A protein has these predicted regions:
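Active-site-adjacent loops and short helices of periplasmic peptidoglycan-processing enzymes
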Residues: 1-133, 140-143
Length: 145
């Protein structure tokens, strides 16, 4: 599986959120039955919500200082496909998108994902690209987290 088909990197869109969740859970594991720590939405991200809505980005409505458990944030990321929560998870983990994206790219290299480049934690940026084979590698790793 993952050895046939186009090996040219193409934009992943929201599939990038699998790596966001993988990196976050690897570094902040949840125990069975736990909701994990509670984070709050930054004023900066709350202020960006109208812009994200205007661009048609997937999101959930948030307000500044709104609490989210780790589990609720991951559910919003993976079920709702909320771009704004992808950026919040990046901030909670690394302080900003750039630091988290560096971790995403380092993780891709560690896993052997040679055709993948991440440029943002949500996949909205078309510069985030990958191959089918690399996504199989990631999904196999994600199933072990």
């Amino acid at each position: 599986m993952g050895t046939r088909g186009d090996s040219v990197p193409t934009p992943t869109a929201s599939v990038a959120k699998v790596m966001t969740a993988y990196v976050f859970l690897r570094d902040h594991p949840l125990t069975a039955g736990s909701d994990g720590p509670t984070f709050t939405v930054s004023a900066e991200e709350a202020a960006r919500l109208p812009e994200r809505k205007a661009r048609g980005e997937s999101h959930i409505d948030v307000v500044a200082n709104q609490p989210f458990t780790e589990r609720a944030a991951l559910e919003a990321l993976l079920i709702v496909s909320a771009n704004n929560i992808a950026h919040e998870l990046a901030r909670w983990d690394s302080g900003d998108d750039a630091g988290f994206v560096s971790k995403m790219n380092a993780t891709a290299r560690e896993l052997g994902m040679t055709g993948t480049t991440y440029t943002d934690p949500s996949g909205y940026d078309p510069g985030t690209v990958s191959t089918a084979a690399d996504q199989v590698i990631l999904l196999r790793a994600a199933m072990r987290v």
